[in-house]
């Protein structure tokens, strides 16, 4: 029995399912989840001491790689001065100024402790600002586990949605409309019928929770247009894409400006953090400036703020993003070439340093239905084949992969060598 198997049995005694977030349990791919003990740069080591090249990167935050020495030293120094104050610090103001200088349309920002808190608070704020209740989200997008967002589509575009988890009151579905991602026509039809009731649209500009699915040309522009026309708030959930796809997030990459942006992951440098920010007239409605309540004991945590500031400082180096783009291009193009050579139906998507791949006959994957139709059993075999060869990919076919600045040419070569062997066995 491996050490991971032993630890998983032990964990299940006191942790539901043995994990603290469902995807970690390997339910999607089968087998025992790998328990990890340490990570450095592009590598992560399991409890038995086996090293893997890591393309999960803690689900996106580690754009500089694991345990970057400058970030680690900054965290140690900050921790020596106190782990939490529950009071204002200069550091949170400095990070707020930095975010507002980099993110399009962000005049003010409020820090929280997770992406879920950020999206939940952004929706509450949008509802208060517009004095409306209905929200639009998209099938396949994930915005955390708050009740209003755990709603899946009904039987038709404008039918009521239904909760996607027990414990979510059905009445919340009355206010949540779930549409097809990348379907601009459907969005326009929905607004034509219900526009005066819609408080906001919330969307992942690049969907990282049905693998990696970019917006088709004109889709984000359509969202901006209908929100402007009907007085609704456009919320871009950049928890995953913020400082991951470009130095100014997906908004800078695609030239779209949100009314409210949610952030997380990279802005904490690996520490727990989230944020939501946007137009001054909207953000000033948050307490204590305005009537919309939001609070948190650990919001603006000084250690997390220090890690975030150092990470963003390092990301300003001009060579960072071109390097990330080149490495990501090399990986996905290499995978496509190898799959084609092996005669495996396969296609890839990537934006910046996010990437995804699909076992499908489709030439381009742009929506949730296509993702659901992919060959998941074949993905699972590929995942385990790569894992055996020391390559750690996301343990689910619906999750994006991530490149870091720490990945080397040797890492890419080793990954493609492993992929060639696995493709030949499928």
Curated annotation (Swiss-Prot):
Could you tell me which SUPFAM superfamilies the record lists for this protein?
Answer: PLP-dependent transferases (SSF53383)
Can you quote a single GO CC term?
A: cytoplasm
Entry-linked Pfam families? Aminotran_3
Listed pathway(s): Porphyrin-containing compound metabolism; protoporphyrin-IX biosynthesis; 5-aminolevulinate from L-glutamyl-tRNA(Glu): step 2/2
* Subcellular location per the Swiss-Prot or TrEMBL entry: Cytoplasm
Cofactor dependence is on: pyridoxal 5'-phosphate
Q: Spell out the NCBIfam families in the cross-references.
A: hemL (TIGR00713), PRK00062.1 (NF000818)
The name this protein carries in UniProt is Glutamate-1-semialdehyde 2,1-aminomutase
Q: Which organism is it from?
A: Cellvibrio japonicus (strain Ueda107) (Pseudomonas fluorescens subsp. cellulosa)
């Amino acid at each position: 029995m491996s050490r991971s198997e032993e630890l998983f049995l032990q964990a299940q005694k006191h942790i539901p399912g043995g994990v603290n977030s469902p995807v970690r349990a390997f339910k999607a791919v089968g087998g025992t989840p790998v328990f990890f003990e340490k990570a450095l740069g592009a590598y992560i080591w399991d409890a038995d001491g086996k090293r893997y090249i890591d393309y999960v990167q803690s689900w996106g935050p580690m754009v500089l790689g694991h345990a970057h020495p400058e970030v680690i030293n900054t965290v140690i120094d900050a921790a020596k001065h106190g782990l939490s104050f529950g009071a204002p610090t200069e550091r949170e103001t400095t990070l707020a100024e930095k975010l507002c200088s980099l993110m399009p349309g962000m005049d003010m920002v409020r820090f929280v402790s997770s992406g879920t808190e950020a999206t939940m608070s952004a929706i509450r704020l949008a509802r208060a600002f517009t004095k409306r209740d209905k929200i639009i989200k998209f099938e396949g997008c994930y915005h955390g586990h708050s009740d209003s967002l755990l709603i899946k589509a009904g039987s038709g575009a404008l039918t009521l949605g239904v909760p996607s988890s027990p414990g979510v009151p059905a009445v919340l579905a009355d206010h949540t409309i779930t549409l097809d991602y990348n379907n601009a026509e459907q969005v326009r039809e929905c607004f034509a019928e219900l526009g005066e009731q819609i408080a906001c649209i919330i969307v992942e500009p690049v969907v990282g929770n049905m693998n990696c699915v970019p917006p088709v040309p004109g889709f984000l522009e359509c969202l901006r247009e209908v929100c402007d026309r009907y007085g609704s708030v456009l919320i871009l959930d950049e928890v995953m894409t913020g400082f991951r796809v470009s130095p100014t997030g997906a908004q800078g990459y695609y030239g779209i400006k949100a009314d409210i942006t949610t952030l997380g992951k990279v802005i904490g440098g690996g520490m727990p953090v989230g944020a939501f920010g946007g137009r001054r007239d909207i953000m000033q409605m948050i307490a204590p400036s305005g009537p919309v309540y939001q609070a948190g004991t650990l919001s603006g945590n000084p250690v997390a703020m220090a890690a975030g500031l150092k990470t963003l400082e390092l990301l300003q180096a001009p060579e960072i993003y071109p390097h990330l783009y080149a490495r990501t291009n090399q990986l996905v193009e290499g995978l496509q070439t190898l799959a084609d050579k092996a005669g495996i139906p396969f296609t890839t998507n990537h934006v910046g340093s996010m990437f995804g791949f699909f076992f499908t006959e489709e030439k381009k994957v742009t929506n949730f239905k296509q993702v659901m139709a992919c060959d998941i059993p074949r993905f699972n075999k590929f995942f385990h084949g790569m894992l055996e060869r020391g390559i750690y990919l996301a343990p689910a076919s619906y999750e994006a992969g991530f490149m870091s600045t720490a990945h080397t040419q040797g890492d890419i070569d080793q990954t493609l060598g492993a992929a060639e062997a696995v493709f030949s066995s499928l």
